Amino acid sequence: MIPKGAIICIVLGVFGSCVVGLFFAAIANEAPTLVYVQGPSLSIMTEKTNFRLGEPINIKIINSGTVPLTFSDASYGLKIKQLDGIVFYSPLSAQIISILEPKEEKTFVWNQTKSDGSKIIEGRYKIVSNTDSTSGNMLEKSITINILK
């Protein structure tokens, strides 16, 4: 026969671990909060951090500052990289100067393919955007996402 104290400890341990697990699962998939600041600022946002393999990913590039930002192409400097820094996706875009006004945002949808059209595998990836360096204010922002099976 199992002592009452052991049963109480086991039940409380199982219940407590469920509560803690649910808490961490909720905060792990929270989207970051956008904060607007004075001066130049660039933000990248997705609706969540964890995505299923093959799920379209909406990427927002936002001017979260008070001055216009200049980009060297129509894709607003968007690149998808592996964590080791190798770029494997960059949208096809015209090489024209693009300007993002304060509080303006541009949305791109990435269908989890590489630039050569092949599908990616599950893993961690970095979404990066950077402004044109000729304007004097070189800004680069990145976020990390997880692709799960």
Model-derived features with residue positions:
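A short tyrosine-centered beta-strand micro-motif
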Residues: 105, 119-131
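N-terminal Lys/Arg-rich, disordered targeting/topogenic segments
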Residues: 1-2
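Primarily secretory-pathway and cell-envelope proteins
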Residues: 5-87, 91-92, 100, 130-149
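Intrinsically disordered, low-complexity Pro/Gly/Ser/Thr-rich segments with frequent PxxP/GP/PP motifs
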Residues: 90-115
